[in-house]
Every structure is written in structure tokens, then in C-alpha cells.
Amino acid sequence: MNDAALAPDVSAALERGLQAQSLDTAFAAPLLRYLALLVRWNKTYNLTAVRDPRAMVTRHLLDSLAMQPYIASGMLADLGTGPGLPGIPLAITRPQLQVTLVESNGKKVRFMREALRHLELRNARVAESRAEALDEPTAYDHLTARALDKLAGIIAVGGHLLRPGGSLLAMKGIYPHEEIAALPEGWTMSEVHQLQVPGLDGERHLVVVRKA
């Protein structure tokens, strides 16, 4: 399947969503190529429980891109990225960002490598590893985690990757009061942004945590 095989309403929904997020609709073309590849591989390899391409636009692409106003450049490690979410959409829309996609599942790693080749995406690479085993201490300005763990758990497995003063950007549903209260020593909550994801009901928050 190529992007042309996706139904017209999928492309239209993505373009509307990009406009709502103040992003250039020129990004629709590479995002649709990524989506088409994900749909094709998902039929065989079960990379995501979301099957419908229109739902993928909202729940994967636009949800991932909701954090892009808060991260523009630097070195980013996306922990437990699965098939490349949010890392690949962020790499597409933020060319100044250098993204490392951290994932230990072999089939998801193979998919991401094919996606990067297919998209000719030069500002992203795949690290086939569990986050805690990645031997790149203090190499990153930012960490992201979309559905990995509670804040303390993310820090436990990936905190060593972040430079002092760097930021963890964690996607959450409802405001995570208890998780923020349980942050380990040396980590402080910097900002919490309530996110608006076009077409997605329910609360979404981006929690920004700083490393001392």
C-alpha cells in the first residue's frame, strides 16, 4: 500500500488536523507515507491495536504531534517508541530535531528501519535496546515517552540518558497529580500543558519534568 491507496477522507482528516495544530499541510505527504506503511505492516506484524487508518490519524499522528510546540531542536530519545510514535512524526515536522527511536521489539525495530529508509528521514535513527540498557549517558537534551510507564518508572529506566538540565516530556491522560508528587529526588515538575488533539475526546496532558 502506498499513500495513494489510503481513502481520501484519511488525507483530508490529516490536513485538517495539521491546520488545527498550526502545522504546514506540506507535512501531510510524508506523514501519509509513514501511515500507509504502518497500515500495511500492521496487517502482518500487529504493530498497533489501532487498525483503522482514520483512527490512526487522530490517535497516532495528531496525538504525537500535539507535543511539537514544546520541542523544537536538540537531541531527543523516544523511549519505548513502538512503531515510532511520537518520534517519527516529530522528526518529520521538526527537522532540527535529532531523534533516537528506542525500542527492543524486533518486529517494530524492523518496521522503523524500513520507515526511515522509505521516508529518507536523515534526522532519526533506531536504537534496538531497552531504555535501561542503552549506554549513552547524558547524551540527550530531551526524552519522550508516550505510553511507557508512570513518571518515576520512565526516569528509572531512562533518566541516565538525559543531560543535567534536560527535560522529560511525558504524554498523559488526566492530570497526573500522584505521579508528580512521587517524582524522585533530583527531578522537578517544570510545566504541565493541557493538549488539544483534533478529533480526540478525553483529556491529554504533556508533563515536562527537569533533571537537576
Swiss-Prot record:
Record bears the keyword rRNA processing: yes
Binding site for S-adenosyl-L-methionine: G80, L85, A131, E132, R146
Pfam family membership, one: GidB
Catalysis performed (reactions): guanosine(527) in 16S rRNA + S-adenosyl-L-methionine = N(7)-methylguanosine(527) in 16S rRNA + S-adenosyl-L-homocysteine
UniProt subcellular location: Cytoplasm
MF GO annotations: rRNA (guanine-N7-)-methyltransferase activity
Coiled coil region boundaries: none
Annotated Gene Ontology cellular component terms: cytosol
This protein's UniProt keywords: Cytoplasm, Methyltransferase, rRNA processing, S-adenosyl-L-methionine, Transferase
Enzyme class: transferase
Keyword Cytoplasm set for record: yes
EC number: 2.1.1.170
Family annotation (PANTHER family): S-ADENOSYL-L-METHIONINE-DEPENDENT METHYLTRANSFERASES SUPERFAMILY PROTEIN
Family: Belongs to the methyltransferase superfamily. RNA methyltransferase RsmG family.
Function summary: Specifically methylates the N7 position of guanine in position 527 of 16S rRNA.
Protein name: Ribosomal RNA small subunit methyltransferase G
Source species of the chain: Xanthomonas oryzae pv. oryzae (strain MAFF 311018)
